[in-house]
Amino acid sequence: MSAIYNFCAGPAMLPAAVMKKAQQELLDWNGLGVSVMEVSHRGKEFIALTKQAEADLRELMHIPQNYHVLFMHGGGRGQFSAVVNNFLGNQGRALYLVSGQWSSAALAEAQKLAGDTQIDSLNIVEKHNGLNAVVLPELHKIDADYRYVHYCPNETVDGIEIFDELDSPWPIVADLSSTIMSREIDVSRYGLIYAGAQKNIGPSGLSIVIVRDDMLKLPSLTQSSIMDYRLAVEHDSMFNTPPTFAWYLAAEVFAWLKSLGGVASIAKINQQKAQMLYACIDANPFYKNGVVAANRSQMNVTFQLADESLDGAFLKEAEAAGLVALKGHRIVGGMRASLYNAMPLEGVAALVSFMNEFAAKHS
């Protein structure tokens, strides 16, 4: 069977080596004669797995000791609610920076839970010569007392990424669902980081939360034990039964990434992949991208065909060539190629070759 390259935005492809290992030990994990899906989450074997997973993640991201690492339920949308309920209390205020669809969704959930009087927002995307560009605000000039400022450094739907570190007088809460471990960041700049697993970590159903110790002292509104960060810390992410198979696969992905040389090594590969695809788009008037170069996402490359009537043919022929899940999000249309850590350079090269051939045939 010829290679299939999956460009899905999420759930995304997992590293082939991780999938093969999971397949090999699916029915007999650690010599126990049963699957990892069948063992007790409180058994010594699984506890050892969780400890190693946290240690590997701390090493990969250089997480300081005054931060807790949590493995939680609920995905990114679950964290939209959890952040508000854990940090705002009855009187606290927060600022949301809006750069695309996912930061807008986080804002909407915050407004639903806390109301407009507690939630402020700023749109940070402007049009520069017809292209979307991020303009970060000078937060130090804002006269307000916020519990936190929330932003999403990578917008998967819009193909927008913010590479500059946010400078804020208030704790920063960041949705890193689509960019976690794709490039190095300084974790110590953040009050809390959360990420749904289904892009760069593992399968859906698991969320990673990295929270600074002092954030847990803020007044809480949460009435949901399952999304209470303090309870999660107290119970080592096992207040209730966790998504054990997703946790196992995340642990394997962390080990795989370490074997490649860590985040610094994969960041170079990710940069190569994105540059290769954007070069193809820029070199051919048959394709167009709507984001300024400085804010083009490395993880989610969005593009449109000059002739939209060819969209269906493009997708059909791409799939026949082993290039799947390239259809853009329903809100924006066009195409989207997601280049998460597990996507090999060969997959992007195959896509570029197909795009050049398709353009030549239809120009």
From Swiss-Prot:
Cofactor, how bound (note): Binds 1 pyridoxal phosphate per subunit.
EC number(s) on file: 2.6.1.52
GO biological process: L-serine biosynthetic process; pyridoxine biosynthetic process
Domain of life (superkingdom): Bacteria
Cofactor(s) listed in the protein's UniProt record: pyridoxal 5'-phosphate
Subcellular location: Cytoplasm
Gene Ontology cellular-component annotations: cytoplasm
UniProt KW keywords: Amino-acid biosynthesis, Aminotransferase, Cytoplasm, Pyridoxal phosphate, Pyridoxine biosynthesis, Serine biosynthesis, Transferase
Subunit field text: Homodimer.
Keyword Manganese attributed: no
Annotated binding of pyridoxal 5'-phosphate, by residue: G76, R77, W102, T156, D175, Q198, N240, T241
Reactions accelerated catalytically: O-phospho-L-serine + 2-oxoglutarate = 3-phosphooxypyruvate + L-glutamate; 4-(phosphooxy)-L-threonine + 2-oxoglutarate = (R)-3-hydroxy-2-oxo-4-phosphooxybutanoate + L-glutamate
Pathway where this protein functions: Amino-acid biosynthesis; L-serine biosynthesis; L-serine from 3-phospho-D-glycerate: step 2/3; Cofactor biosynthesis; pyridoxine 5'-phosphate biosynthesis; pyridoxine 5'-phosphate from D-erythrose 4-phosphate: step 3/5
UniProt record similarity statement: Belongs to the class-V pyridoxal-phosphate-dependent aminotransferase family. SerC subfamily.
Record: residues binding L-glutamate: R42
Transmembrane segments: none
Protein name: Phosphoserine aminotransferase
Record's keyword annotation contains Amino-acid biosynthesis: yes
Its biological purpose: Catalyzes the reversible conversion of 3-phosphohydroxypyruvate to phosphoserine and of 3-hydroxy-2-oxo-4-phosphonooxybutanoate to phosphohydroxythreonine.
InterPro entries according to UniProt: Aminotrans_V_dom, Aminotrans_V_PyrdxlP_BS, Pser_aminoTfrase, PyrdxlP-dep_Trfase, PyrdxlP-dep_Trfase_major, PyrdxlP-dep_Trfase_small
Any Pfam family the entry gives: Aminotran_5
Annotated positions of the N6-(pyridoxal phosphate)lysine modification: K199
A GO MF label: pyridoxal phosphate binding
